[in-house]
From Swiss-Prot:
Organism: Arabidopsis thaliana (Mouse-ear cress)
Family: Belongs to the cation transport ATPase (P-type) (TC 3.A.3) family. Type IB subfamily.
Cytoplasmic compartment segments: 1-299, 361-367, 428-561, 624-920, 972-995
Pfam families from the UniProt entry: E1-E2_ATPase (PF00122), HMA (PF00403), Hydrolase (PF00702)
Keyword annotations: ATP-binding, Copper, Copper transport, Ion transport, Magnesium, Membrane, Metal-binding, Nucleotide-binding, Repeat, Translocase, Transmembrane, Transmembrane helix, Transport
Presence of the UniProt keyword Transmembrane helix in the record: yes
Protein name (record): Probable copper-transporting ATPase HMA5
Catalytic activity, reaction form: Cu(+)(in) + ATP + H2O = Cu(+)(out) + ADP + phosphate + H(+)
Binding annotation for Cu(+) 1: C62, C65
A Gene Ontology cellular-component term: membrane
GO molecular function: ATP binding; ATP hydrolysis activity; copper ion binding; P-type monovalent copper transporter activity
Amino acid sequence: MATKLLSLTCIRKERFSERYPLVRKHLTRSRDGGGGSSSETAAFEIDDPISRAVFQVLGMTCSACAGSVEKAIKRLPGIHDAVIDALNNRAQILFYPNSVDVETIRETIEDAGFEASLIENEANERSRQVCRIRINGMTCTSCSSTIERVLQSVNGVQRAHVALAIEEAEIHYDPRLSSYDRLLEEIENAGFEAVLISTGEDVSKIDLKIDGELTDESMKVIERSLEALPGVQSVEISHGTDKISVLYKPDVTGPRNFIQVIESTVFGHSGHIKATIFSEGGVGRESQKQGEIKQYYKSFLWSLVFTVPVFLTAMVFMYIPGIKDLLMFKVINMLTVGEIIRCVLATPVQFVIGWRFYTGSYKALRRGSANMDVLIALGTNAAYFYSLYTVLRAATSPDFKGVDFFETSAMLISFIILGKYLEVMAKGKTSQAIAKLMNLAPDTAILLSLDKEGNVTGEEEIDGRLIQKNDVIKIVPGAKVASDGYVIWGQSHVNESMITGEARPVAKRKGDTVIGGTLNENGVLHVKVTRVGSESALAQIVRLVESAQLAKAPVQKLADRISKFFVPLVIFLSFSTWLAWFLAGKLHWYPESWIPSSMDSFELALQFGISVMVIACPCALGLATPTAVMVGTGVGASQGVLIKGGQALERAHKVNCIVFDKTGTLTMGKPVVVKTKLLKNMVLREFYELVAATEVNSEHPLAKAIVEYAKKFRDDEENPAWPEACDFVSITGKGVKATVKGREIMVGNKNLMNDHKVIIPDDAEELLADSEDMAQTGILVSINSELIGVLSVSDPLKPSAREAISILKSMNIKSIMVTGDNWGTANSIAREVGIDSVIAEAKPEQKAEKVKELQAAGHVVAMVGDGINDSPALVAADVGMAIGAGTDIAIEAADIVLMKSNLEDVITAIDLSRKTFSRIRLNYVWALGYNLMGIPIAAGVLFPGTRFRLPPWIAGAAMAASSVSVVCCSLLLKNYKRPKKLDHLEIREIQVERV
């Protein structure tokens, strides 16, 4: 029996860690000693969750082979059970990973004479954690690539993504081999600042600030009190700031409990202690970004204080009589007042304001890579130290004539810092979508106190961050819903547009779910909290969008490849430019008239070399894709379209074929009454009262649809009191019958009526035939053996489904419907919606096979579905789109989630991906074009014919402007509007008739 159970579970791919969560078992093994004459039994205890591994075993031909493999495996210590399937060449092993590993099991199978390869290892899946780290100090793709290489070299790291645009890293790692502390250390050793955002563990962390007169002993008492609470993992106290960090399981406890424990603690004369949630201000991404903006702004202002006088003394005052004479006054030998002023003012710009470029260069070069900081440091150093050389020579030589370039280095640094300031500001705007989502949660909430009967006994306004699971909160009109939950009292309309994009307010009544961050418009609601913190819908949306922005689009690989050799190539070109012009001048390959009066050939060559070095911009290439993806995914989230990263965006813009599931995708997903035909003169309200009283006792979906529709004719619509039904009988496959108000009521199909000799008139037969042609279910109603009415029940098409398919055709996208329903219903729905290609009676694996067939035919396929049976096809498709109202499994398998559950968003998703990708292309054209044109111009390619040259400070300004322009180009996506065709879609109305 156990073997059959294991085999069945292998087929169903259940997780054995759930079936056997923790087993404490004593295993015995024999150990031969002294020639085998004696043996001792060693018992060892294993306190370890069972893991499952599945191997493909080749070479087994019969049950004897399977038996030999099973025996060999079961001899190993730590094996709980083994099931060998010779027919399918599979071996499924349940084992304790602390006692035996999968490699030992594989070697044992091969020692038995068979070839084994691991297919699935649940231990690896369970042991993987994902942590997110914010990284400060990255300037270009070279920095992000360096950090990725560093992280991927750490033992236990399985995958690492570093996003330059949002300055974050997502690391998948095995906590048994590494830790997030080690990851932070490696990033900091690489020369960058690292701040942990989340650990990936199923715990939450909160920081509390304690106010009051505290001693070390009292802090220890608080620490012990908190550690004694169920669900608290660890408590860490920072004595300098009186801050307490608590790591806890949100399912068990919460921050309000911590504050109550702390504030209930009294230490003699110290009195009560006040605890509040600690706010560090600069921890969040937005706060950190604002701090970075302020830092660049201050640096730029200080650079102006020194650079403007340098510029004036070098470029302006030299042409003003009187001032020129003062500046040209010789102090020592050939050293002038102007040179001294420029040297003194340029030095703090070079070594104080420009210090960030030195540190950035050092960190990059220490790791064997080069970035933008290296180019800036080399270029400004060349200008500054050559200028310093001219000052020293002028001070020590009575006949030296030279020109300093202090204005070049100072202006170069000032313009680059200005560019960085504008770039950081623009990059900050690319993440505004996330900031807006995070700000949706209200600051406070009204907590209700209830007695045992559920009556409200009091209310209290609390910090919104103190809400815990199973709390009951009050939502007043005009207030935001404080947390996810369901309504236990009241009714209202809630504006969910900020989460789902749905423009119209959604009616809410008892039992309906509400989403934290949405706006209650009218009416008071009492909501029981079901999800808080990282589990909330808002937090999950934010996390999904953040993960999407971390994921690189395949086109980003182009920039990554270029960045590896870009800076070394630019340094080589810069040196070659200087050398070529220097040799040309020394060898008199160009006339001396080409040399400006204030320079010599060496200085002219140096200017060209520096210009090449500082005009090149790898940052523009690095920002081309991630900034567009950031804005695109943010805009999508605001439209109710959650796109899981750049890869999904890139694939979606190529889609030319969409496969639709029927139920819940093209249709509403639940039956409703769409038509009522009364054959006798009867009041509709009375008719439905009798029918509902009969059907309310049935659990059939069609019965529930009829009862739900009947409520519309009642004044007490929310909780109607139906007449009592006596002698209720449910006849499987036919219908129900009961006695209501002394009348015999039958509701069912033709077979039910025929069995009870109820005459079905011709017009009723026609109605049934019409219903069948329209993929509807015809239901007959008789009263006292006389047919009174015909109901048509169907799963109606979603509003605008037909128009959505038509718009897709206009976009040259082919639509196909695949469903598990019968061919009659499938063809009827397809005709109604306008789909030509239909596949019916398809199993889940057949849906996936159809997707693969379309891909083999050259189509780029998107699959749109909502159910568990759609998951294989969603995974197989180039782009999987899950209807937001569908199951969690379908949503997990998809690349794009449609929050509003309507088909219009399929069009929006594809259109947005096309617009985003065209923006990425435009960014690359600009970034590559800028470098391909700018570098030759800076090198002096136009100088021989036009005498036009690019001074280094202008080249630096152009470099800074190129990055800003790429970011601004991406920001234009924020103005995205969905296709105008979607604004004119007609809504299908449900028809109700009566005679």
